[in-house]
Amino acid sequence: MDQNVSTALKSFTQRYIDLWQQQTGRPPASEELYGVPSPCNIETQDNQVFWLPQPFVGEANLANVERALEIQLHPDIHEFYTQQYAGDMKADLGDHRFTLLQVWSEDDFIRLQENLIGHLVTQKRLKLSPTLFLATTESEMTMASLCNVSGNMVLEEFGSGKRTLLASTLAHFLDALRPVFPE
């Protein structure tokens, strides 16, 4: 039976937390998010913040993005970005290393929406079908994105039409990810 995005995201997040617990005996930590307020913050120490996911609060959709571009977004993207506040998480899928993007706080959710709008405006200007980024790669020009039309997860090169299928759905993509402890 197929999982929904919410269940798949919670499952991946728990696998990521479990990996950190196995490696360090602690919850996940981030130096990049040190000093940035968040409901996820459970402790700060040695210039890093330890975090655990927290329920998302506020308007649980990306309606601002839809209104700005007069577009209807795929339901999976709403579900992905409005399930939880959490830190970004490293993962592998096949030969690809990803950083799964997450919303850290209410302010971060506003920034995310602005970035999604910018991404979609660029695609519209280049006459590309719309995608919504969910994960970055080691290359600044390559990302994992949800195709807004098909719901497929694709590896795409920013600003080009080059896209490679990663998974048939976002839930399948999340299920297939293997959490990675940061190096």
UniProtKB/Swiss-Prot annotation:
InterPro entries with a match to the protein in the record: Syd, Syd_sf
Pfam families to which the protein is assigned, alphabetical: Syd (PF07348)
Keywords associated with the record: Cell inner membrane, Cell membrane, Membrane
UniProt keyword Cell membrane present: yes
Gene3D superfamilies recorded: Syd protein
Membrane topology: Peripheral membrane protein
Protein name: Protein Syd
